[in-house]
Every structure is written in C-alpha cells, then in structure tokens.
From Swiss-Prot:
Catalysed reaction, written as an equation: RNA(n) + a ribonucleoside 5'-triphosphate = RNA(n+1) + diphosphate
Protein name stated in the entry: DNA-directed RNA polymerase subunit beta'
GO molecular function: DNA binding; DNA-directed RNA polymerase activity; magnesium ion binding; zinc ion binding
Entry binding sites for Mg(2+): D460, D462, D464
Subunit structure: The RNAP catalytic core consists of 2 alpha, 1 beta, 1 beta' and 1 omega subunit. When a sigma factor is associated with the core the holoenzyme is formed, which can initiate transcription.
Binding site for Zn(2+) 2: C840, C915, C922, C925
Species for this entry: Aeromonas salmonicida (strain A449)
GO CC field: DNA-directed RNA polymerase complex
Cofactor binding notes: Binds 1 Mg(2+) ion per subunit.
GO BP terms in the entry: DNA-templated transcription
Matching Pfam families: RNA_pol_Rpb1_1 (PF04997), RNA_pol_Rpb1_2 (PF00623), RNA_pol_Rpb1_3 (PF04983), RNA_pol_Rpb1_4 (PF05000), RNA_pol_Rpb1_5 (PF04998)
Family: Belongs to the RNA polymerase beta' chain family.
InterPro entries: DNA-dir_RpoC_beta_prime, DNA-dir_RpoC_beta_prime_bact, RNA_pol_asu, RNA_pol_N, RNA_pol_Rpb1_1, RNA_pol_Rpb1_3, RNA_pol_Rpb1_3_sf, RNA_pol_Rpb1_4
Cofactor: Mg(2+); Zn(2+)
Length: 1434
C-alpha cells in the first residue's frame, strides 16, 4: 500500500524546466498528442447523459467520466486501473485525464490557420511574397494560382481567374499545374527552398540601394531565418489535422429542465465536424466541382471561426445573437486566461469586512473579529484540538467548533498568537497596500486598523472594506513578519520619507499641546522637570500653554553611539515639557521646542531685565511638517525600534490632548473681515469703469474680459489677506503687564495652521469670498461669487458653483481609470528589472546639479544625490586633488552634510541608466533602498517598485490641460531680470557684442545667466533671450534686487555684429516691402512682405540688409570671411533708411513676436503618459542635426530650405522647414549639434539622437518631476531612471560586423553587447548600433519574453510572431514566472532560483548517478501495480 501511495505522489511531480519554447505544430505532432479521432458532432446522449461514442465528449478517446470506472460499468475500482474495457473501449483511470487528453479531426481538405494569414503582417503572405488579398482570393476559391508553370510562359504563384485558367488549359493542357484553395497555398509553401532564398536575399541586400526594397527584403529575410533557426516548416501554417481541446476544458453542464449550458467551443467544433464529414461524403461521391469547392470554403470559414471568431468577415453568432467565444478569445483580454486566471487568482483562507479605528492598538497589531478568526484559522484549530486529545477525529473537532465550545476560544487564542495576518485594501496601488499585522481578537464584526497605517493604505473609516489573508506555511509567516510587518514599513519606497506620519486629530492634539499662550494660568513658574510639569497641569495649577522654566535632562548621542547626559533649565511651555517625556533617549529637546533666535535688541533687553525671559519662549508649535521631520530624524538616528515606539506614543498623546483641547468648528469662528465691503465696492467701481471704456471703444472685448478677471482676482487676494490677518493674530496682555501679539487660538485657524485639516484656500471660501468660478470648458466666468459660505449663496451663485463640483466628480472617475492604466503599462515594462549583481564596475554616471528655476532652488543638490553612489571622486572645490568622497561610496545624510559644508555643486552619481549589467541592474548603480535606508539588496524588484511609485500618485494628478489666459498670462511676458540673491554674475554659452553705450548685447540663443555665491555655488539661473541688453559684465558682483538685463518681449531684434553703413538689397516698395506710417508718431517704417503676399515678381527675391564700409565694400563678420548681411523674414520691421550708419550691437530690424495667445499646456496625467510613451509632440522643436554654419537655400511654396555647412568640411545637411515656424537662427550663425533652431516642445527621440543618453534621461526625469512637483508629490528620480532604462532597452543595428544580425533591425542592447564581447574575444568585427527610445507600451510588447508580452496586450499578434520564430522564453522576468506558477526571481525567490540552478549544476557535475531508463521505469511500475493489485481497498 505504501508503495502505491508513493507512486501516486510521484505521478504529480512536475518537471524542472528553464525555459519555454513555442512553435508551430506539425500534423504528426498533433496526431501524437491525440488519443483518437473525433468523427461525429454528437456530444452526450440526452436521455442517459452518457457521452456518445466518437463524439466530442467520447469517453474512449478522452477518458472515463467517473473515477476508475469504465463507461458500461464492467470495471470499477482501483484494482482494475489501466485496464481497457473490451465492451466500451474506455481505459479505467482518473477522470482528470479528461482535462489533459486531446483528440483530433482529420480534415478532408487542408485549411489555413487564420492567425498566420490575417495577423498583420501576414506571415503566409510574407513568405510567398504575395499580397494578402491575393492569398485570400485563392483560399476562398475565387481564383487559381499557378504552382508549377512547367514549359509554359506562366510564372509560379501567378493568379489566374476562372476564364484565364480555362484558356491556359486549352492552350497548354496538363503541362502546367494550377490549383485553388488551401491545397494550392500548401503546395506553394512546400515548394519554398528556405536556405536558397535566404542566400539570394542576403546578396540582394548587399546590392540594392533603395530604402523601401531594403525594408521589404529585411522583413522577409528575418522571417525566413526565423523559420530556419526554429525548425518550423512553412507548410505547417496550413492545417491538415485539427487538434481538439480536452472536453473538461469546454464543459457541457446539464441544467435543470433538460437544458444544457455549454461552452461556445462545442458549437464551433460541431460546425467544423459537420462540414468536414459532409465534405468527405461529397468527395467519396465525386460530386460536381462547384459543390465541393463551396463545401471546402465553408470548412475553411468554420475552422477560422473556431480559432479566432470575427477575425475575418462577420463573427459567427450563437442562438442569442452574441458572437461565439473562440479559442483566441479564451486567452486574450481582461477576462482571458492570462489576466483572469494566471496573473491574479482568488485565494482561500481570506475574508473581508468593514474597518474601524483602533486607537489603542500598537503599530504592529490589528483587531480581528472573533467570528472571522474562527473561520480563517479553522484547520489550525482542528489540528490543535486533535493533538491535545480534545477531539478524536476531524469530524468531532468540526462539531466542537460549530458549537463554539469554550475550549475552542482558548485554542483560537493560542493559534493566533504570533501568527501574522495580511491586510489588504483595494485598490492596491503600491506595495504598502498589503501589510502584515499581529491579530488581536475583538468582539464585533469590524476589523480594527491602526490609525497611522491609514496613509499607506489611503484608507478612511467612511465604510471602507479590507481583506484579510492568512499566510499558512512557515516560510510565508516568516516573510510576513520580516518583510511585510507594518513596523518594517515606516518609510515610503517612493521618496524615502516616513509614511507612518500622524495626521488630522493627532496633529491637532500635538499642535495644541505645544502652543504657547500669553498670560496663561501658571505663567512664569519654575519646575523641577517634565514629571512635575505634568503634575502641575493635572492638578490644575498651570495651563498646558503656560510659559514656564523647566529643568530638562537630554541624552545626546555621540559620534561613537554612546549617550551623554545634559541637564539644563529651559524656557519652554508645560505642554512641550510633558511631550518631552516620550522622546527617545538620544534625541535632543530642541527637536520639539526650537529655541527662539533673538535679535540683538531683544538680547540686550533680556540682559537688562531678566524677568522678560517669558518673551524668549519660542512661539513655534509642532505642525504636520515638523512631526514628519521629527520621525525622519528619529529613524536615521535611533533606528527602527525606537521610531516605532515613538510613533505610537505620539499618536496616543496626540489623541489624548486633541480630546482635551475641545477644538470645534462654530459659525462664529469664521470671522468675516470688515474691509471686505470696501474692497468689493472698489472692485465693482473699477469694473464699471472698464465697461464704460469698452462701450466707448477704447478697449477690445478680449482686453475688457482679461482686465475684469484681473480686478476680481486681486480683490479676492486682498479679501483673503485681510481675513487671514484677522484670523491668525490676536493681542493680549502678559503677566508683566505688557501687550504682546500671538497666534490666534481660533479653532478653524488652528486646524489649518497645524496641517490637520483644511487650508487657507478653504478658509477663504468660508469667511472671505468664494471668488471666480470656471465654466465646464475651463474658461472663467467674469462675475465672481462675492458671498462666502457663512453668508450663504443665492440661487445664481449656487448654480454657478455646481459646474466646478460636477466637473470634479467626472474628472475623478476618468482619472482613476487612466491612472490605473498608466500603472499597468509601467509595471509591465519594468517588471523584469531586478537587482541581479552587486557591482557592474562601470565608470559612467549622470551629473547631478541642483535644480534651479529662475531665482528659486526647486530641488537642492542634497535631495538629488542622497542615497546615490558616487561615480567619480568628489574633489573639494578650490583644491586640485583633495578628495572629499571617494568613488563607489554611498552618500548618506552625513556625507551630504559634508558636501553642503564644502559647497560642492555638481556630483557625478551612478544611475540605473548607465548600469552595464546585462539583465537587470546592479546594486551600486541603484543606490539606497529608499524604504530601508541602506544599499539595496540583491533580488530587490526595483522595476515594479519604480512603476508603483510613479503610478500610485497618478490619481492625485489632474486630467486637465491648462489654458493659460487671463490673470496667468501676465507673468509670461517678462522683459527684465531682477536677481534675488547677492553674488557674482556668470554667463554660460554666451555670445555677445559691445554696443555704443558699452553694454553687452547677447547674440546667442541658449545663454544662461547664473548668480554664484562666494563659494562658487549656483544660487539662481535665468535664460537670456537673443538681443537682451545686459546692465552688468561677466563676473561682476551684484546684490539682491538689482536689474541685470532688459529686452523687449514683443519683438525679436536682429543685432549687428559690426559697424558700417546700411545697404538694402531686393527691397522694392510694393514688391517685397511696404511702407507704413504710425498715426500717433508720424514716423514711417519699412515692413517686409510675407512671401504669400508678394506679387509673383517678388517671390524669388530675398530682402537683405548688408553692411558696407565708406567705400561700398562688404564688411566681414569679425574672425570669419562671411560678409555681414542679414536676411529679413516676412513681417520684419526696419526703422532705418538705406545708407544709414549703424554701430555694433544696434538693431537693424525687429520681427514682431505673435503674443503666443492662450496656449494649452498639457499637464497632469496625460503629460506623464506622453513622456513615458515617448510620443512625438505636435510641432516639435527643430534641432541642429550637425554642428556648422547656417545658411538658407532655395525656398519652395510653403517651406524654407535650411542648410548647415559643417565647419570640419563634411557633408552638408539640408532640411525643409515650414515658413510659419519661428526660426531662432540667422544666416551665418554657428550652431552646435543638438542646438534648438526653432522653438517648440523638444522631442525625446531627437534629444537621444543628437545629444545622447544622459540628456534624454535628464529631460524625461525633469519633465515628469515638474508634473508631480506641481501637486506636491515627492518621487525619487531613481524610479523614473529605472523606467527610462527600460525604454532604452532596444537599439538599431548600424553595421552588422561579423554577427548574424541584419542592418537596421531592432535588437535588445544586452544581446548585442553579449555577442560583441564574444566577437572581440575572438578578434572579429563587432556590430555597431545606436540606442533607440521606445514608448512603454511598445517596449512591453517587444520584450524578449513572449509570455510577458502576450499577457499585456495584442495577445494574438505576440503569440503568432513568437510561434513562427520558434521563440524561447528564458523566464527571466517576474510575470513569466507567475504565469508558469513559480516563485518570482526577486526577493526571497531570487535566492531560491539561485539555489535551484546551483543544485542542478552540482548534480550535473556529479556524473555517474545511475539514470533509470524509460523502459525500466515502466517495468517497475508494472511490478508495483501487480503487487498492489493483490488486495482490494474499500
């Protein structure tokens, strides 16, 4: 018996495998899978419910319907296993073979497989070099195709219509062979000589020069080579045998009432079998050709429908007019096999319930209702009951649990102790959406959740539900405890900031207890310590906010981690002293009570009057930001354990004092400022005045609208300012009898000020005025809502308000779907990005500098390099070789402080993009694991983490495109630069000339003006437009507030670089120019006509201004032999006359800039999606393809010809540019490769091609960050870099070298690199390539793994391509492994896979292990069965 069980166990053992290969099935292979031919369309007998013989459910072919029982009932039970019944022919075995055994149908005529025919590009068409239309005409019997031309003048695969065929027959008889239908295509495919074709095509490729021909040949060549390498034969794309799916995978279930529920596949198979049998009969009867042909066509159509219904023609529908679900539909889409059953499954041992607050829980606990726990832990309880001897059998244990006996609860307590459970809240947008807790049993039916983890789950208690899962195995429990416990997930993986941060009530409570109040009860007391402070407060002798002196003992952490005690008397408040009781040892008191920085005058006053110490108490209370910083500091200094305890204590304390504070919202808290009436009246008067101006025609409608909106916007600002001043400050007399100002104790103000709830904007709507509202299309309604919510709205105001509210709801719904889809694409592209090695040894990296926009540092260097590994030694500024930080060092907080102290302003750090690991990434290039704070571990799935970090805040982003108009566009037209910092000027990429006033005039496009401080750090940077006049010199010192540059924002000047006399060319009045006189000033100016406006005589002319000297000779531009001449584009205005003298740096002409109207700026989610999809912008910036000198060639109707002549004498580059594009360059100007020639949004593809990998990475990272920064979301750059690395996975082959690659084909970079290393080692020529940027969808679909790609999108296309190419899936990524049902090669699975591979390698080395041959195994099995057949088992 034991042997038998052993044998049964052995049966289920799976094979070890490393990769999965997909290919075409040959007819013989299909027959070898099959257990018999299905000959009849019958399914089951409607009376006996037994399957019909030879039918679709036949037991003889597919196996018995009942376990170990043949159909007629002659053989039953295990002892007859393997016997084949002589009456009904059914093998006695388990029913589950009906899920595995396949059948087949012998087709009477071959049929084409629709996937290889219709899936674009058509594989059959590509191989035969015929168009899809022609092939379809042959297949569906509309025309003949020549198969063997013989000695005739026909050609192989030539199409012949019916008449042509008959004519040819008359002329040549049976000299030639032509057929129609799939037989014809089959014969053509059989006739292909793959090797010969490949050879001729490679020769063709070497000879041809035409691009289209190359492309076509390359495609065909790749397909042919794929066939050759994979061992597939082209004729297998035409089927002569059709496999039949095992019946249990297409079940037929009898419903009550004698009807059946059936899978659509059965209908489709029945159709095929019926037509096939009819065709066989017709062929036997030798029916007329036309009937046979029709039947063959119908057979082809029914096979098409079975494989992929609806791919060709109309889909076959069932009885209910719904298209039938074919085999292809079974695997694709959200409901298909991949996404429904393989990537996500429902699991056992889980339950869900509503959540409520558990304010008394510790951070690692959750409250689990007893009822749920009993159900979830049932098997454990049964086991315990049995092992204790309290129940004899499982049945008895079950009864006890059902009766809920007292002993059961005790056992449940034991079972649950230290057994973590997982809590999950949908939608799980990032990994913190599932965390582990230790359950504590509670009464009631709701799960209790710790308030601090709500932020990570994005949960609230308005009816949210959560699911509980029980990790069963020891390993699972271990992982839950070590990796997923809520106490181990204090930092957010997206930004490395704490995510366990108190919010709402807790913040309010802590804020309230750390506030100081003037003249509170007990002001001026001196207390012995925090304990006494608490006693005094509890006894009611002092108020929580009283300013007192307290003796505080701090423990300061030294460099060697030892603690030093320091006690001193501090000026503080009672509340802060009480709060210091929960500070972990090693954190200084200043973290919760920052000492006030006194001015010199205040210090002198304090020295003179010591009793004034009350005023030196800091008036800063703990807000949300400070609390977050407090926790962060605690984590970095004290470590995990202290932080967890501290966070819990903060929460309890916060709740306690929030309750005591009694902060509430009353209508009287919304104080309306007295100034509101006057401000509104003044605004209304201004609006009336503008209306009068409009009616008298002084301003246009547009100007009136914009001005009105400006007026109301500023009125709103003034009202809200008055309101906030009113709310936020109050004056009071202190114990010394002096009046002092303090922050208000108004409840509404406190809630907003602490960061607990609400914001200034919301208070403004309550107590100020609601302000301007937008229409649904985004334009602003010019009459604002002057009322606020306290005063109440009238009907019209209420109606206007509904627009915004409704649009908000609609947006949210859209946003959620779009954001989810973006996350899905990101996960899919990055899923195989895992840390696979410790160090790849590269010296490459990205240069990091602080991000500066205008005068503001948006992101300091410290935040950008923290947690990165240095790629190059950081040299101390001002020295030649003093190394601050050596390369390959991880920059932690201390080292970043060091860099800041030494004012380093650029660091080269390693990055995922420059990592040289072939598959995955190395730990050093990634840097710190943000959620843990140390160097990332091997096996960390950084790709998925990156995708989640970018996708999770997606729902917070807006969906809208911003219309910049009205109030906002004022800022756009800047005309000067005022510096905000004191320092020295530095110009970068500047070209300039000195004008007559000896000021610098900028003559280059990409000039940046930066302000450096005395340490050489960049403080701010500004872009200078062409033609701006500088008030300062390079290197000059400036102080904050100085204006350093001016320009005219509305026109674009053309600046002279030399002095001379003007000479006009081709400037003929009425032909190329016209004169206009200004009505106000009476001055006349010359305006150049646009090409379209000129008479035909002037079309070819190019109006030019030349500079000549006194003798009329051309003046040269200094340093070149190019004459100084300036071509004038259309619409240019010239204010000087012919022959006028000009100096250096003067403007000879001005080009009016169209005020760029209300441009739509794509913002929010769509912008992020565009960047990651690497979409080409509508009108991208035009970049210089090579470095050289600009000139303009012959113009065509709507375009200008731009010519760049390289300085080093290479080939000239020409490009046609539409006339309406505003060019930034003039004739004779020198440009560098990649410089912007015409403004517009830059295309990432151009940046990569012309500037390289590093700039494109920076561009995408900065653009994505801009969107998130606007919403206040912090994401580390690393995550974006990981995604960009995946977008740069592919390259285009420029020259193949000695590899077997084809020029112009797109291949994974890793594959080329591996091949090249091999070639270089052998001394051969490696291939050269250039990187290409792919959007995330395209990158996901073109990954090496076909399983991963097929489960993402376009399943049919991916699988078709993979099958034809005979692709192997190496199962490297996470998705593939989930689908084949293995541990993923990341995290703990990384180690498992390594161990597996090593074990196998060791087994392979230990040769000489006796291997059992198949025959021996069979013999052993037979012996076993005979042995076990001797006894019968009940």
């Amino acid at each position: 018996m034991k042997d038998l069980l052993k044998f049964l166990k052995a049966q289920t053992k799976t094979e070890e495998f490393d990769s999965i290969k997909i290919g075409l099935a040959s007819p013989d292979m299909i027959r070898s899978w099959s257990f018999g031919e299905v000959k009849k369309p019958e399914t089951i007998n409607y009376r006996t419910f037994k399957p019909e013989r030879d039918g679709l459910f036949c037991a003889r072919i597919f196996g018995p319907v009942k376990d170990y029982e043949c159909l007629c009932g002659k053989y039953k039970r295990l002892k007859h296993r393997g016997v084949i019944c002589e009456k009904c022919g059914v093998e006695v075995t388990q029913t589950k073979v009906r899920r595995e055994r396949m059948g087949h149908i012998e087709l009477a005529s071959p049929t084409a497989h629709i996937w290889f025919l219709k899936s674009l590009p058509s594989r059959i068409g590509l191989l035969l070099d015929m168009t899809l239309r022609d092939i379809e005409r042959v297949l569906y019997f509309e025309s003949y195709v020549v198969i063997e031309p013989g000695m005739t003048n026909l050609e192989r695969s030539q199409m012949l219509s019916e008449e042509n065929y008959l004519d040819a027959l008359e002329e040549w008889g049976d000299e030639f062979d032509a057929k129609m239908g799939a037989e014809a295509i089959l014969a053509l495919l059989r006739a292909i000589d793959l090797e010969g074709e490949v050879k001729t095509m490679r020769e063709e490729l070497d000879q041809t020069n035409s691009e289209t021909k190359r492309k076509k040949t390359t495609k065909r060549l790749k397909l042919m080579e794929a066939f050759l390498q994979s061992g597939n034969k082209p004729e297998w794309m035409i089927m002569t045998v059709l496999p039949v799916l095992p019946p249990d995978l297409r079940p037929l279930v009898p419903l009550d009432g004698g009807r059946f529920a059936t899978s659509d596949l059965n209908d489709l198979y029945r159709r095929v079998i019926n037509r096939n049998n009819r065709l066989k009969r017709l062929l036997d009867l030798a029916a007329p050709d036309i009937i046979v042909r029709n039947e063959k066509r119908m057979l082809q159509e029914s096979v098409d429908a079975l494989l992929d219904n609806g791919r060709r023609g109309r889909a076959i529908t069932g009885s209910n007019k719904r298209p039938l679900k074919s085999l292809a539909d079974m695997i694709k889409g959200k409901q298909g096999r991949f996404r429904q059953n393989l990537l996500g499954k429902r699991v056992d041992y889980s339950g869900r319930s509503v959540i409520t607050v558990g304010p008394t829980l510790r951070l690692h606990q959750c409250g689990l209702p007893k009822k749920m726990a009993l159900e979830l832990f049932k098997p454990f309880i049964y086991g315990k009951l049995e092992s204790r001897g309290l129940a004899t059998t499982i049945k008895a244990a079950k009864k006890m649990v059902e009766r809920e006996e007292a002993v059961v609860w005790d056992i449940l307590d034991e079972v649950i102790r230290e057994h973590p459970v997982l809590l999950n809240r949908a939608p799980t947008l990032h990994r913190l959406g599932i965390q582990a807790f230790e359950p504590t049993l509670i009464e009631g039916k709701a799960i209790q959740l710790h308030p601090l983890v709500c932020a990570a789950y994005n949960a609230d208690f308005d009816g949210d539900q959560m699911a509980v899962h029980v990790p069963l195995t020891l390993e699972a429990q271990l992982e839950a405890r070590a990796l997923m416990m809520s106490t181990n997930n204090i930092l957010s993986p997206a930004s490395g900031e704490p995510i366990i941060v108190p919010s709402q009530d807790v913040v309010l409570g802590l804020y309230y207890m750390t506030r100081a109040r003037i003249n509170a009860k007990g002001e001026g007391m001196v207390l012995a310590g925090p304990k006494e402070a608490e006693k005094v407060y509890r006894a009611g002798l002092a108020d929580l906010h009283a300013r007192v002196k307290v003796r505080i003992t701090e423990y300061l952490r030294q460099a060697d981690d030892s603690l030093v005690e320091r006690t001193e008397l501090k000026n503080t408040t009672v509340g802060r002293a009480i709060l210091s009781l929960i500070l972990p040892k090693g954190m200084e008191y200043a973290l919760i009570d920052e000492p006030k920085v006194l001015t010199a005058a205040e210090q002198a006053d304090l020295d003179a009057n010591p009793q004034n110490w009350i005023k030196s108490v800091s008036n800063k209370a703990l807000g949300k930001k400070l609390i977050s910083r407090l926790l962060n500091t605690c984590y970095r200094k004290q470590g995990l354990k202290d932080t967890v305890i501290f966070a819990d204590q903060l929460m309890y304390t916060g709740f306690h004092y929030a309750a005591l504070s009694g902060a509430s919202v009353g209508i009287d808290d919304m104080v309306i400022p007295d100034a509101k009436k006057d401000i509104i009246a003044a605004a209304e008067a201004e609006v009336a005045e503008i209306q009068d101006q409009f009616l008298s025609g002084l301003v246009t409608a547009g100007e009136r609208y914009n001005k009105v909106i400006d007026i109301w916007a500023s009125a709103n600002e003034r009202v809200s300012k008055a309101m906030m001043e009113n709310l936020s400050k109050e004056r009071d007399v202190n114990s010394l009898g002096e009046e002092e100002e303090q922050a208000s104790f108004n409840s509404i103000f406190m809630m907003a000020d602490s960061g607990a709830r609400g914001s200034a904007a919301q208070i403004r709507q309550l107590a100020g005025m609601r302000g301007l509202m937008a229409k649904p299309d985004g334009s602003i309604i010019e009459t604002p809502i002057v009322a606020n919510f306290r005063e109440g709205l009238n009907v019209l105001q209420y109606f206007i308000s509904t627009h915004g509210a409704r649009k908000g709801l609609a947006d949210t719904a859209l946003k959620t779907a779009n954001s989810g889809y973006l996350t899905r694409r990101l996960v899919d592209v990055a899923q195989d990005m895992v840390i696979t090695e410790d160090d790849c040894g590269t010296v490459e990296g990205l240069w990091m500098t602080p991000l500066i926009e205008g005068g503001d540092v948006v992101e300091p260097l410290r935040e950008r390099v923290l947690g990165r590994v240095v790629a190059d030694d950081v040299i101390k500024p001002g020295t030649e070789d003093e190394i601050l930080v050596a390369r390959n060092t991880l920059l932690d907080e201390q080292l970043c402080d060091l860099l800041e102290r030494n004012s380093v302003d650029r660091v080269k750090v390693r990055s995922a993009i420059t990592c040289e690991t072939d598959f995955g990434n190395c730990a050093h290039c990634y840097g710190r694991d943000l959620a843990r704070g140390h160097l990332v571990n091997k096996g960390e799935a950084v790709g998925v983490i990156a995708a989640q970090s970018i996708g999770e805040p997606g729902t917070q982003l807006t969906m809208r495109t911003f219309h910049i108009g009205g109030a906002a566009s004022r800022a756009a037209a800047e005309s000067s630069i005022q510096v905000k910092n004191t320092g020295s000027i530095k110009l970068q990429n500047a070209k300039f000339v000195h004008n007559s006033d000896d000021k610098l005039v900028i003559t280059s496009r990409s000039t940046e003006l930066t302000i450096m401080d005395d340490m050489g750090r960049t403080k701010e940077s500004h872009k200078l437009p062409y033609g701006s006049v500088l008030e300062v010199k390079d290197g000059q010192a400036v102080s904050a507030g100085d204006t350093v540059a001016n320009w005219d924002p509305h026109t674009h000047p053309i600046i002279t670089e030399v002095a001379g006399r003007l000479q006009f060319e081709h400037m003929i009045d009425g032909v190329t120019i016209t004169r206009q006189t200004d009505e106000l000033t009476g001055l006349s100016s010359i305006v150049v006509l646009d090409v379209n406006e000129r008479p035909s005589a002037g079309k070819e002319m190019r109006p030019t201004v030349k500079l000549v000297d006194q003798n009329g000779k051309d003046v040269m531009i200094p340093g070149t032999d190019v004459a100084a001449q300036y071509f004038l584009p259309g619409k240019a205005i010239v204010n000087l006359e012919d022959g006028a003298n000009v100096g250096v740096g003067d403007a000879v002409a001005r080009i009016p800039q169209e005020s760029s109207g209300t441009k739509d700026i794509t913002g929010g989610l769509p912008r992020v999606a565009d960047l990651f999809e690497a979409r080409q912008p509508k009108e991208p910036a035009i970049l210089a393809e090579i470095s050289g000198t600009i000139s303009f060639g012959k113009e065509t109707k709507g375009k200008r010809r731009l010519v760049i002549t390289p300085t080093d004498g290479g080939d000239v580059y020409e490009e046609m540019i539409p006339k309406w594009r505003n060019l930034n360059v003039f004739e004779g100007e020198k440009v560098e490769k990649g410089e912007v020639l015409a403004d517009g949004p830059e295309s990432a593809h151009d940046i990569l091609r012309l500037r390289g990998i590093s700039p494109v990475a920076n561009y995408i990272a900065n653009e994505v960050q801009d969107v998130y920064r606007l919403q206040g979301v912090k994401i580390n750059d690393k995550h974006i870099e990981v995604i960009v690395r995946q977008m740069l996975r592919k390259c285009e082959i420029l020259s193949a070298g000695d590899t077997d690659l084809i020029e112009g084909e797109q291949v994974e970079v890793a594959r080329v690199k591996i091949a090249n290393r091999k070639l270089v080692a052998e001394g051969k020529t490696p291939a050269t390539f250039r990187h290409i940027l792919m959007g995330i969808t395209k990158a996901s679909l073109s990954t090496e793994s076909f399983i991963s790609a097929a489960s993402f999108q376009e399943t049919t296309r991916v699988l078709t391509e993979a099958a034809v190419g005979g692709k192997r899936d190496e199962l490297r990524g996470l998705k593939e492994n989930v689908i084949v049902g293995r541990l993923i090669p990341a995290g703990t699975g990384f180690a498992y896979h390594h161990a597996r591979i090593n074990q196998r390698a060791a087994a392979a080395r230990a040769v000489g292990v006796p291997q059992v041959t198949a025959d021996e195994a069979q013999q052993n099995l037979a012996d076993l069965l005979n042995a076990s057949g001797s006894f019968d088992e009940e």
